[in-house]
């Protein structure tokens, strides 16, 4: 069996991937404030296949609680409208020619708390992903040390670097959560 290689850069990249994934997931949560990323999960039936909203229209934010969607192809307006209505966002599109407007309703306290719970769930998934990457890195180091490829001192030093990368990623995840929580709870 080939000896596994230890690459701290790869471990950091994988941890950063978990943070990026969390940011994307949290970006799609409704906060009562209009953001183009709110429509990222919506798929539109276009030209015989399912496409992301960004590939059929431009989404802008003319007001804090209003999204404006400029559909590029006039024939796609009804499909975009249908995709928005069928999404679980609970938004009601208003169409004016090739432009669709979405007013983002105020969220009540109960809905805000539900969104915070969902944000915590996404955050815990990201923390678990980071911990899995840490475990993989530490397992490789232990195997290398056991096989005599690195000294015990090197194993301990590199394990400390893996732990530092883990702590940095977890702190970044906590920061992303705190920011999103503040945004959700803001009235």
UniProtKB/Swiss-Prot annotation:
Database matches in Pfam families: RRF
> Has the keyword Cytoplasm been applied to this entry?
yes
GO annotations of cellular component type: cytosol
Q: Cite a single GO MF annotation.
A: ribosomal large subunit binding
Main function: Responsible for the release of ribosomes from messenger RNA at the termination of protein biosynthesis. May increase the efficiency of translation by recycling ribosomes from one round of translation to another.
The protein's matches in NCBIfam families, at most eight in alphabetical order, are given as:
frr
Tell me which family the UniProt entry assigns to this protein.
Belongs to the RRF family.
HAMAP family documented for this protein? RRF
Record-given protein name: Ribosome-recycling factor
Gene source species: Methylorubrum extorquens (strain PA1) (Methylobacterium extorquens)
């Amino acid at each position: 069996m080939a000896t596994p290689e230890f690459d701290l850069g790869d471990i950091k990249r994988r941890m950063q991937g978990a943070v990026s994934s969390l940011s994307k997931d949290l970006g799609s949560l409704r906060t009562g404030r209009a953001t183009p990323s709110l429509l990222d999960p919506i798929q539109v039936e276009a030209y015989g296949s399912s496409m992301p909203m960004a590939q059929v229209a431009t989404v802008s934010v003319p007001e804090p609680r209003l999204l404006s969607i400029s559909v590029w192809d006039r024939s796609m307006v009804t499909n975009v409208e249908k995709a928005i209505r069928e999404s679980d966002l609970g938004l009601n599109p208003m169409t004016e020619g090739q432009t669709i407007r979405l007013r983002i309703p105020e969220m009540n306290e109960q809905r805000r708390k539900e969104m915070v719970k969902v944000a915590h769930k996404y955050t815990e998934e990201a923390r678990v992903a980071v911990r899995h990457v840490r475990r993989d890195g530490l397992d490789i180091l232990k195997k290398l040390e056991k096989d005599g490829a690195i000294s015990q001192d090197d194993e301990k030093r590199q394990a400390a670097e893996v732990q530092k990368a883990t702590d940095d990623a977890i702190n970044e995840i906590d920061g992303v959560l705190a920011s999103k929580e503040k945004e959700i709870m803001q009235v």
